[in-house]
């Protein structure tokens, strides 16, 4: 059993390494951002499930239930892979707040379902910015299992974007990609 002093020494080493990793990004650090986004996304999906109103709210709530279960599975799978790679995970609310780039919105409870769907699309799209960066870093570091998991997550997110966009009557990338002026 570790003494309090040994625990503190390990924790301070973790904090120091996290600071280094976030100033010179590593695959592990970038995937920490991915985990934080998944955690924030879970809270937002739950909030939407609790407050969805409208003519098709039961179908929407069922969809959210599925997305929540998948989100939990993805978060656990990502955590396990990082542990397999010898990484230290973000686990506290403070870390998720610091590393997450999805924004929480307490007003979601008042939104209609199309606004909630648009928010989910934006979140999956934002999450993919970090996932794509994690893929590049993992490949550069030759951490191929991490890269493979992130490629899988990218595909999952893209599929969710397409499905949600179709619920709004839009094509998969409609309104999401910046237009090239050339």
Where are these regions (language model features)?
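Iron-associated oxidoreductase/ferritin-like identity signal
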Residues: 1-182
């Amino acid at each position: 059993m570790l003494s309090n002093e040994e625990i503190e020494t390990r924790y301070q080493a973790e904090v120091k390494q996290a600071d280094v990793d976030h100033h010179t990004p590593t695959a592990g650090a970038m995937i920490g951002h991915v985990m934080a986004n998944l955690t924030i996304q879970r809270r937002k999906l739950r909030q939407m499930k609790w407050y969805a109103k409208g003519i098709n709210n039961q179908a929407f709530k069922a969809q959210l239930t599925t997305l929540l279960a998948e989100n939990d599975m993805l978060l656990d799978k990502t955590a396990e892979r990082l542990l397999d790679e010898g990484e230290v995970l973000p686990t506290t609310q403070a870390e998720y707040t610091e590393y997450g780039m999805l924004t929480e919105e307490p007003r979601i409870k008042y939104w209609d379902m199309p606004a909630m769907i648009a928010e989910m699309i934006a979140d999956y799209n934002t999450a993919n910015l970090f996932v794509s960066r994690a893929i590049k870093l993992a490949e550069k570091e030759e951490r191929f299992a991490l890269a493979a998991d992130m490629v899988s997550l990218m595909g999952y997110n893209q599929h969710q974007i397409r499905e949600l966009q179709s619920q709004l009557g839009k094509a998969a990338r409609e309104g999401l990609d910046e237009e090239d002026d050339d």
